[in-house]
Every structure is written in structure tokens, then in C-alpha cells.
Amino acid sequence: MERKGFIGGSDMNVIMNGDWRKLWLVKTGRQESDDLSNNLAVQLGSYTEQFNINWFKKDLMLIDVLNEQQEFKMLWQGIPLKGTVDAIVKSEHAILECKHTYESNTMENCLRQYMPQMQFYMWLAQSSSCYLSVIFGNRKWECVNV
């Protein structure tokens, strides 16, 4: 995935953790971004995303979920911003962000980790809420509305 030329949702934790230099190097093309094509956790999360959306719809009995990813863009103070959300709950104009994590992780940890990304997406999409739908290992699913 091309990561140059804009600030995206995945960059929010890097910014919040203060690793500005590495982000700047990647965004300006001075350094390649990490190759995640052989990262099992990343690939598994991508592969199970549609299943996660379907489970969310089934559990919450929602039929108005746009299943395809939605991209939002903005130019803010001359800085291109872009966010690709996993899905949208149309009736609420809410974002759905799907994650797949290890079994012993907690929703509290996931909220802490992904809150910057979710807030960024909500701002870009001009949405007041975001569902975080998380599969923990292969035994548990939880969802919260932020």
C-alpha cells in the first residue's frame, strides 16, 4: 500500500507515541514503510474483516451497514489527510472499525490502542460515533460504540 503524501488513520498511533521522525521519513519517501505482507497478524485481520462486519450486522441485527470500505479525504492546513474506514452504519452515520487480536487481549486495551485512529476517522467522516468490533482469538467477539 502506498503510504506517501498524506497522513492516514494508521499514522495516528505513531503521531501520538511521538515517533515523528520515522513517520516523516516514510511520508516524504526517504524511507520505505514496513512491509506487512508477511505479517500473520496483519494479514489475518485483513482476511477476517468481512467476517467481522457480517458478525457485527448479525449480532446487532443491523441491515443498513455499507460493507465496502469508505474513503474520506480532507486538506487540513495544507496537509492531505486520508482515512479508509471498514464500513459505515448508514442510519447512524457511524463508522465501523474492525480488528482481530490475540485471545487474551482486552477491549480496554483495544480502545486505548485504536482510539486515536477512531477519533481521526470520526473527524474526517464528520461522524459522532464509531463502533469498534473486535474478534479475540477465535473464541470471543465484542463491540463497543465510542
Kindly label every feature range from the protein language model.
Residues M1-N54, D59:
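Charged, glycine-rich intrinsically disordered N-terminal tails and low-complexity linkers that flank
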Residues V42, K58-V146:
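Nucleic-acid nuclease catalytic cores
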